Amino acid sequence: MDGRTKVYFTSDAHLGSGYHADPRTGECRLVRWLQSIEGDARAVYFLGDMFDYWFEYRTGVPRGHVRFLGQVALMADQGIEIHFFAGNHDVWFADYLEKELGAQVHHEEALVTLDGKTFRLAHGDKEYCGLSWTNRFLYRLFRHPVARCLYAAVHPRWTVGFALSCSLRSRKRGVRKATVGQVPHAYHNEYFEIEKEWLVRWTKAHIEEHPEVDYYLFGHRHLLVDLALRGEKRIVILGDWLQYNSFAVWDGSALWIDQFLEEEDQV
């Protein structure tokens, strides 16, 4: 593990989504990024929605994603810590990633201490569900054991296509939606003052009761945010792999956002 000093955070690749112009190209780009960091990574945290859809049956998982899963397995075999957080698109993790990849799976937010600093890590859908009753209802529904059992009883030939089409429609609606109630809502950074973003407002309230947290990291919102809060405390929203190809890096003393840019991106 000599030379492995950095911790990486990323989210929202939405592998398998029809919103990717070419899903295979998007997956291969993500794999190339993982290959580029495996020499210095001590841990990688995937903060949710790495898959556009994921449901584990007792004896099966969704087809596809083999290049990504294979690369993650190779990194885990080298001793790199791998953490998957459930998002709202891939909420139904069971034990496949733990048994086959050696990953740690988190179904809730987690407090992690790295080099003496406290990180609060979460996908962000739980915090964001306070925005409306529909968000709260769907959050609880998707995590209810009865709902999961009933869903598992339906043949995948129906559920997979249904779930992916719902995801695509939701994404298209979200791109067009300017607000949710009185709160700004969109999938890009150019639409409003970032101080009004719901997760920023939520974090400012949370930090008043939890001053021990140094860094808040979220996915979910498809925004690139690195905002100072109080003192050296910060909130980071990780962007995505649909438009930003973004991630965050902790090197033991500093945290920053970066993007995986290849030659064609820099022309």
What are these regions (language model features)?
Residues 2-6, 10, 15-114:
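Core catalytic region of metal-dependent phosphoesterases/phosphodiesterases
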Residues 258-266:
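Short, solvent-exposed aromatic-acidic interface loops
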Residues 100-107, 118, 125, 129-137, ...:
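Conserved beta-sheet core of the metallophosphoesterase superfamily
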Residues 16, 91, 128, 244, ...:
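Flexible, glycine-rich phosphate/dinucleotide-binding loops
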Residues 250-251, 265-267:
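Lipid deacylating catalytic domains
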Residues 11-14, 49-50, 88-89, 124-125, ...:
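Active-site metal-binding loops of divalent metal-dependent hydrolases
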Residues 124-201:
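Active-site-proximal loop/helix segment associated with metal-binding centers of metalloenzymes
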Residues 52-75, 170, 184-213:
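N-terminal short leaders/motifs
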